[in-house]
């Protein structure tokens, strides 16, 4: 409770330039870290074969759609949450946090189900050729399974940021990226799982 009071005081009484700087730096680092996630996969997959790299490239568009859904619910609900917290309407803020989370999860689940059902046509739509099709289906199939969790994590991340907890949001994103940097080479190279390990 003390932390939320401190946030309220900081966001409403601190000089505007200081608030912007304090919120912007962790947000920028979070965005760069998200890009690092994709770059790490491409780097380690590059040691397998060119088809695998192409498959990861084909899947980037779908990953962007999944991320956009997370940002959609995160920014929409987060904006409302911040205004309600500013007005000290805590119950309304809590309701919106739950609503944003649930809608994000359900949309992610819908993407996962439809994506798995139409995996082959989806890969072709994204630009997959017959050569890279098996690799793209393997990689994108796993990405789609994680869609509900990706959307909800990004939604929660943005909700935290809108509450003035940009530092916690950054730590959450960075821990995921670091975990990926450790697990990707282990699964791809050491356990020889190939593109599935990415």
Predicted stretch roles:
Residues 22, 44-64, 130-135, 195-198:
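Interfacial/gating helices of multi-pass transporter permease domains
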Residues 1-24, 81-148, 179-182, 186-198:
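Short alpha-helical transmembrane segments in multi-pass integral membrane proteins
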Residues 170-172, 197:
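Hydrophobic alpha-helical membrane segments of integral membrane proteins
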Residues 27, 31, 43, 60, ...:
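Transmembrane alpha-helix boundary and packing residues in multipass membrane permease domains
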Residues 13, 17-36, 40, 62-69, ...:
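Residue-level signal for short hydrophobic patches within transmembrane helices
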Residues 32, 36-54, 123-130, 186-193:
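Helix-terminus/linker motif at the lipid-water interface of multi-pass membrane proteins
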Residues 53-113, 150-169:
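Small-residue-rich hydrophobic transmembrane alpha-helices
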